[in-house]
């Protein structure tokens, strides 16, 4: 089960690299830093070793926000929900909560990619 989760996270990260997601928390040309994305909605949260995966998720939602496919309220609510789940995981780490956190984050990543794909022609087939 643990190998399957790791494979899923690795697959999501590889996919993130293919769709133009920054590979550093510092951002890049046209991509705000992870801290800047978090500050759009409040105080930054320390995601520890999950920071890059969370950043990829936030960045895809940010692209949808910038292209008018997502409201700022929904973007900030999305960030808040992820922060809340991460806090619950960090408060009580263990195999079950790690699995629940990984599954939740993968679901959120898929949602963010869906929002981005709706407004970003580089993610559409064809």
Listing of model-derived features with the role each one plays in the protein:
Residues 31, 48-56, 69-76:
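Soluble non-cytosolic domains of exported or imported proteins
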Residues 59-63:
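Amphipathic alpha-helical segments within well-ordered protein domains
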Residues 26-52:
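Post-signal peptide N-terminal segment of mature Sec-exported envelope proteins
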Residues 14-17:
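C-terminal motif of bacterial Sec signal peptides marking the signal peptidase cleavage site
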Residues 1-8:
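Bacterial N-terminal signal peptides that target proteins for export
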Residues 19-22:
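Bacterial signal peptide processing site
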Residues 66-126:
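Compact alpha-helical subdomains of small soluble proteins
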